[in-house]
Amino acid sequence: MILFRPADGTSLPRTLRRPCVGPAIRQKALLLASLIATGSISAAQVSGQGLQPDQQPSSVRGTVINCVSHAPIARALVHTPDDRFAMLTDGEGHFEFPLPEANPESGTGFVVNGQPHEVRLYERAGHQLWLMAHKPGFLDDPNERSEGSPGSEITIALMPEALIKGRVALSTADSAVGVTVQIFSRQVQEGLPRWLPGTSVRTNSSGEFRFAELAPGSYKLMTHESMDNDPVATVPGGQLFGFPPVYYPGVPDFAAAGTIELAAGQTVEADLSLTRQPYFDVKIPVANGEMNGRMNVSVQGQRGPGYSLGYNPGDQTIEGMLPNGNYVVEAATFGQNSAAGIVNLRVAGAPAEGSTMTLTGNSSISLEVKEEFTETKWDGTGTWSDGKRTFSLHGPRLYLHVGVEAADDLEQPRGGSIRPPTGPSDDALVLENLAPGRYLLRLNSGRGYVASATMGAVDLLHEPFVVGQGTNTPIEIKMRDDASELDGTVTTIATTPPAAGATVSSELSSPRAWVYCVPLPEGPGQFQQLAVSADGKFTSPTMVPGSYRVLAFANRQPNLPYRDAEAMSAYDTKGQVIHLAAGQKATVQVQLISSSE
């Protein structure tokens, strides 16, 4: 975004910064406007370093380019959300919008701020306006950032889409029409890379499929199982056939599936072959299923999604059809007092009935919090209410937020939340409704910091914990408030001289850059993201003691895998390493890491 200065002399964001967006969005945003003026002022009054009205720029112009080839993009639509400004770029990718003349009486016009290339169009009762660029076949580029100055060229970079396309072939040599193909992408959540399910498409009459508007990254493909409904080949009452799910390049296991690495603008061909197999009726009795209860049933072959069964509440059985193989069938109920069960099932050339599944109530785990605070006076307050009763909160229940998430890829949410207080004196923290599985503990505190969290010998700040049937080992948490302090400077920004005759203001500025404090592997510490002010400064008054690698980037890094030691090894020679003791105040200087590094 382009940074601007409002009428009261405070500064606002300066450079064109574009957030990372999903592949389906083909737009580039450039902040141009807005702010509500608090009085009638002239352009000359806005600040001592502002341009005079007769020096105001008369237009905003620029070029839309391909961020890979840097070639101009012709006939790209550039416009504001309200379409007050809108036009197609010419054959050289250029666009230019005429701007209204500065009006000192109404308080509209352009103002140049203290930092280089700053400009803001403001209106007395305006709202934020962004320039967006659209072009079929292009995406937003999350790694690029442009700067512009009044009357100068603004460059908006778009990223060419990547494509995965292919053909599905059937062992019967029939046309694979209507086969569902699904894509999975590797994305970072809470600092951990995970495989997440994406969109699905159906093959056309030629068995072809196509995934468009893909950003650079890692992908996997799979087909959903489908039945052979050919009326000519199907005999009433006879054997039924289907096509089991297949993972690219032709394996039955998600973990063994090949990873497709895509670069910007790249097209990859990925063909899949399906084998027709006999399907057999399967049935699994549920001992304590409810007649009207809802139940989620999942089926795993080797590992991963693909097969499906359903629950028949009338007969209290899990039913469906599967091909030959060994399966793990899991079932879970919803809501309070939820339960789960698991059985193994083998299908070998005939209808199969599994052993009876017994649903067992999910586990609850107590959290024992030990406070080692040096500051005894804390004025935090809060209440809990269910609409009928209201209780005041005390102790860790007031300041400690506790959550869990599945530790493994593609795992469905398995519950796990803090039990509401049962009365005004109930300060106990209990994680309830935890189904069997592996979990990651997530802790955030509004007071002090989490010094340690363990479950037996397991360090929950770095390792997952396992919940089995009847798990009751408590989680022990230690809280402290002797945090460290960190001040720093991004030297690349701090040494950039301002424009001639200009001053720099960091008040209300949007960040010039972002600093990430990444705890070193297996050590104490807590990840932090810090904003860098216009003068290159950043600070954190509440750093958890520990060792960190401090990294600085021009743009936000939402996909930084800070919990993945192997992935973060790429930054072993970048940034600065600091060691913070309890209560220590430290200062650090770092340089920006360019998008090409």
Regions inferred by a protein language model and the residue ranges of each:
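N-terminal secretory signal peptides that target proteins for export/translocation
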Residues: M1-R26
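Long luminal/extracellular ectodomains of secretory-pathway precursor proteins
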Residues: I2-F4, L32, I36-A37, I41-E597
